[in-house]
Structure formats: C-alpha cells, structure tokens
Amino acid sequence: MSRKNRIAILGAGRLGKGFLGAEFLNAGWNVDFYDIDKKVIDNLRNGEFSVEMHTPYQTYKKKYSGYGVYDVNDDISKPLREANVIAIDTYPQDIYMLYPLLGKVAKHKLAQKKRLSILVFTNKTNLILSITEGIKNYLNEFENKEFDTYVEVKDAIIIRSTFAQSNSALEVQSLAVTDSIIEKLAYNDISNISGICESDDVHRLKSMKLFTINGPHAAYAYSGFYCGLETMNEAELNPFCQEVALGVAKITKRVILNEYKLKKADLNRISISNLAKDPILDSIKRVACNPIRKLAYNDRLVYPAVLALRQGENYDFHAKAIALGLLYVDETDEEALELQDYLKNNGIRETLKRYSQLNETHDMLIRKIIYFYEELKKRR
C-alpha cells in the first residue's frame, strides 16, 4: 500500500486511536490525529500508543507510532487539507464547531479539483444532511454547486467498540468481533481497511443498531449504576440488570421488526454475534454518560418504548430502564448534572416532556416511568 493515502482523525480518544488509528495504520495509510484536549495531544506526541485487540480467536497487543498529531486550537487547515479521508469522531453536539474548518478544507479541495471523503462516526442518527449543510454554509454559490462532485459525507455504524481509562490514555482495548459499517464510498478506496465493511443500507441499519444494541447496553449501564457496580462486565452478570436489559432487548427486537417490516436476517447484519476470547473490561460510566442524549425521543430507549406503547406490547422494561436513566448521577457529567437539576426543580413529568419529548399522548408510558422511578428511589 502506497503512503499517499492520508486520513485525518478528528477526535483522538478511545475510538480514534483504538479502532480508526490502529486499522488505518495497519493498512499503510498516513494517519494524523486532531484533538482539542491538550492532554490527549501531549500524550500522543510523546511517542506511541498500544491497542489490545480482542478477537473471537485470540487476544494480542500491538504498538503504534509514526503518526501526526495536531491541536485543533491552532490553524490546522493546511495539514488537514492534505487528507483525502477525514473521520469525525467527536460527540454529536460538538460537530458543529468543525464546520468552519471543514468548510476551508472543502474550499481547497474544490479549487484543486481533488476528491474528499468525510466519514461520520457517531451513534446519533440523521446527522449527515445537517453536517453537509453546515459545511456548505462556508462556501460560495459556485462551490456549493460543485460540492457533490468532489466531496462526499458518509455515515457510519459503530460496532467495533473500544475502551480505555480515559480519552488521553495510550493503552486501549478494542473489541474486534464484528465489523463497523460505512456508507459505500465513491471517491476513495478503503477496501483494505480491516474492521470496516461498506453498505448502501446504512441509514436503516444504523437506526436498528441504535435501538437493538445500544438500547439494551444502556439498560445494563443505568441498572448497573443503580446497583453500585462499576463495570459493564459486572452488570451483565447481575440478575437485576439482566432482567431489565434482556427485557428491553426482547421487546425492542419485536417492535423494531414490526415497525420497519424487517426480517430477522436484517438484524443479524448489525448484531454482535461473536464473543471475544477474552472480554474487554468496560466501565458503566462510559456507556451511561450523556443521559440527555440517550434519553431523547428518537434515541435508544424512549423510541422503542413509544413503539411498544403504540403496538400494544409490554413497555415495562423500557419504562424501568428510562427511570433508571433518570436516577443516574455523575458529578463529572454535565448532562447528568443538568438532568438532575431540572428533575429537582420541575419533577419527572416535565423532565420527560423537555428531554424525552413525551406528552399527553404517551400518558400511560409516563405514568409507568414515574411509578418505577419512585419505587426505585425508595429502595435505593
């Protein structure tokens, strides 16, 4: 593989290093990391990072070096425009801050008549149009007309999970049992990248994955926190957590198959069917973080609960998981603090209305969430 291919990874945290950085370096690409966190940048500049790969057959560790590192606070438009692929690996709520920078890069590519692929790695759905428009706002009329000829913005489904003690940690674990999925690229060839497959059906599959995999995962995290556990591994073995999460998984699968008129084979495409030989140690706080986003109407727990309500299915497990999410407290998590503050001052019903967009048409679901919230709080 020639080293002429260059990927810029915007966000050098767990996934940025442990999945994207490692696999593109393995394939012989030039890899540049960009981040806003000084500790992340300084650690990477000091040498190398290591990834412990957990596959169904073996666990092995590999060290990586020979990459570039850049501070997003500096003027990085010049090095960034050398990339023919840009991977966005930041929190969804922070992506808008990249629009001016990506606009500069797109402007340069259009002037040079060079192709650029922008890959968006986030669990949030339906972002591609807004990201594309956000970038195009920094282009003139002629450049906007030429945009699609040279620039493509593609969605991705994150299935390859990673874990580290922090975003700045240089030792990362990667669960390499199922490939992540990216919308098929037209302008760059990434077929030699391990752990990634391309598909024309990402939009539909991403929603399915969010509900059927991330939903039960969140249920394990919030129930595990309630039980005083620290790792997802502990939660997966806890009877209380199992009851909630497996109930969420069973009902979610049923209502999603019915709502989208799917076959079970469709779900198999995004399921984690293989187990790692040695499971990675994952923290509950990593999975439970940002509860405002994860308790939103179109996200992993609330929407399947609404579908269950509409379809006449049992929504008790989802209601309990949502109640447990409302009980999640983390002094280092801004969203958790905001949610708890609003709950304290406005009550559960108003909180669900504001953050989960539940209204009088969902009254039975709201009542059930309130019931579980009050019962769980008593027993805490």
Model-derived features: where do they sit?
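Substrate/ligand-engaging "lid" and interaction regions
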Residues: 2-8, 14-380
